[in-house]
């Protein structure tokens, strides 16, 4: 489902050159409302005070690596997919063409690459992986489908990708670093006088410092294309 939804943004990009970030945000914003309605309506658990579905049966939940924490075997799936994406992007013909389309669309088109195809396929793949991430969260972290459980997950993914500079293997330490910031901010708010605003500012400053080089490179490449 995630791949199909993200694929729509790729189709819009191919047909009308729309910004895939904006279209995917608009589509997901509408679908989140529908999913929340289903969770709190037809699938709501009347025995639970939470706005959520019934708990996932134990036999379908992911095994915990540490019983006292929420860390589960989805970590190994994430490592596997990160390595798989790295291999696909750097060791296959399709991956090479996909990277060329991302680096310079006109150069790729001049080289005979079907640029339109590689506007849709990456969106389908990334949407599918994002859908898997949501499934892992339900089966491993929450053990049920909560209203708004995916809030901010997509933006976190963008932040991690910026920190990792779009390197699939670097996504692993980048995600751990980002999770450390998130957990540290929550712990600071719970165990000290640090407010949510202060924690958010500290996170933002660290994030901007880490991603400054990536943003500078993005702006520089756009200037070179304009010239």
Predicted regions located by residue number:
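Transmembrane alpha-helical segments in multi-pass inner-membrane proteins
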Residues: 124-204
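Short, Lys/Arg-enriched, Gly/Pro-containing loop segments at transmembrane-helix junctions
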Residues: 46-50, 95-100, 219-227
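Cytosolic-side transmembrane-helix boundaries in multi-pass membrane proteins
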Residues: 103, 110-117, 183-227
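Terminal peptide-recognition signature
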Residues: 12, 19, 30, 98, ...
